[in-house]
């Protein structure tokens, strides 16, 4: 049985990973482990990739799993607008590495202002929307889209994309 270690105990990340594995019909054992990303509490731009990779790599080390998976949400200033997205990073014991990025969405200035004051996106969203711990539920994306797209939905697609070098037997071991 293949084991995959998720570098987080966030219930949204666990649920999204389970859903992606179900869609892929992969009967893998999922281990969720609390891993520090090694980057700032609110990563910006490239830090998001570093944090996701650190989570994946350290999840393997902590659990001796076959695959490590890290999910890190971040923000970045693009053409004067702040966008939010997530990076999903996958590493196997054999050293195969791949990543994928979620859809991006712009953040309103009220949330950006709080982020620039040192708040994390989830914390800033909770302040603006008067919610509690939204990062373990619908997330900023759910609050902004009236839950048409929630945080779990945002993560499922990049998890599937990041894992393709492992589950796609046609390209497995040929491109990576």
From Swiss-Prot:
<dbReference type="GO" id="GO:0017111">
    <property type="term" value="F:ribonucleoside triphosphate phosphatase activity"/>
</dbReference>
<keyword id="KW-0547">Nucleotide-binding</keyword>
<feature type="binding site">
    <location>
        <position position="36"/>
    </location>
    <ligand>
        <name>Mg(2+)</name>
    </ligand>
</feature>
<dbReference type="InterPro" id="IPR050299">
    <property type="entry name" value="YjjX_NTPase"/>
</dbReference>
<keyword id="KW-0479">Metal-binding</keyword>
<keyword id="KW-0460">Magnesium</keyword>
<dbReference type="InterPro" id="IPR002786">
    <property type="entry name" value="Non_canon_purine_NTPase"/>
</dbReference>
<dbReference type="GO" id="GO:0000166">
    <property type="term" value="F:nucleotide binding"/>
</dbReference>
<keyword id="KW-0546">Nucleotide metabolism</keyword>
<comment type="function">
    <text>Phosphatase that hydrolyzes non-canonical purine nucleotides such as XTP and ITP to their respective diphosphate derivatives. Probably excludes non-canonical purines from DNA/RNA precursor pool, thus preventing their incorporation into DNA/RNA and avoiding chromosomal lesions.</text>
</comment>
<protein>
    <recommendedName>
        <fullName>Probable inosine/xanthosine triphosphatase</fullName>
        <ecNumber>3.6.1.73</ecNumber>
    </recommendedName>
</protein>
<dbReference type="GO" id="GO:0046872">
    <property type="term" value="F:metal ion binding"/>
</dbReference>
<dbReference type="InterPro" id="IPR029001">
    <property type="entry name" value="ITPase-like_fam"/>
</dbReference>
<comment type="subunit">
    <text>Homodimer.</text>
</comment>
<keyword id="KW-0464">Manganese</keyword>
<dbReference type="GO" id="GO:0009117">
    <property type="term" value="P:nucleotide metabolic process"/>
</dbReference>
<dbReference type="InterPro" id="IPR026533">
    <property type="entry name" value="NTPase/PRRC1"/>
</dbReference>
<keyword id="KW-0378">Hydrolase</keyword>
<comment type="similarity">
    <text>Belongs to the YjjX NTPase family.</text>
</comment>
<dbReference type="Pfam" id="PF01931">
    <property type="entry name" value="NTPase_I-T"/>
</dbReference>
<dbReference type="GO" id="GO:0103023">
    <property type="term" value="F:ITPase activity"/>
</dbReference>
<dbReference type="GO" id="GO:0006772">
    <property type="term" value="P:thiamine metabolic process"/>
</dbReference>
